Regions:
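Double-stranded beta-helix
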Residues: 3-4, 98-125
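Short, conserved beta-strand element in jelly-roll/cupin
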Residues: 55-72
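Short beta-strand His + acidic residue motifs that chelate non-heme Fe in jelly-roll/DSBH
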Residues: 51-52, 72-73, 90, 95-101, ...
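A structure-centric signal for secondary-structure junctions around beta-strands
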Residues: 36-38, 59, 102
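Short histidine-centered beta-strand/loop micro-motifs
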Residues: 30-33, 50-57, 74, 80-81, ...
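Short acidic-glycine-tyrosine-enriched beta hairpin
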Residues: 76-94
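A short, N-terminal "cap"/entry segment at the start of jelly-roll beta-barrel domains
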Residues: 1-46, 50-53, 121-125
Length: 125
């Protein structure tokens, strides 16, 4: 990375970091380290659900559907992303999600701050 360029493949790189491609959790000095924004390539099998609700949320997020059918759940409503390119933006809202079909999403969150990771499920890396 001496030329300040990193080229990768989201499907290949994402599994090493639970889907995350960029954020505070990448090693300092890595071009993918950022305290400003986080980017995720999320691949979710049908029926996959966030293990627990995000509470005390202080960040904003943009979720874009690449393929599948993906539901973002909020305290008083849900938004279903059903067509490629459908998206939702939210800020400081508690939420969860559910993959109604096998889905691929791109998630962007800002700022990138520690403390929101869900504990790993048994057998998860």
């Amino acid at each position: 990375m001496a030329d300040n360029i990193y080229a990768g493949s989201a499907p290949a790189d994402a599994p090493a970091n639970r889907g995350w491609l960029l954020g505070h959790f990448m090693p300092a000095g890595d071009l993918r380290h950022s305290e400003e924004v986080e980017i995720k390539w999320g691949v979710h099998p049908r029926g996959d659900r966030r293990a627990q609700w995000v509470t005390g949320e202080s960040r904003a997020a943009l979720i874009i559907l690449v393929s599948g059918r993906f539901r973002i759940e909020f305290p008083h409503r849900s938004v279903v992303l059903a067509n490629p390119g459908d998206y939702v933006v939210f800020e400081r809202v508690e939420h969860s999600w559910y993959a109604e079909e096998e889905s691929v999403i791109v998630g962007v969150r800002w700022p990138s701050i520690p403390g929101y990771a869900v504990p790993l499920r048994p057998g998860e890396k």
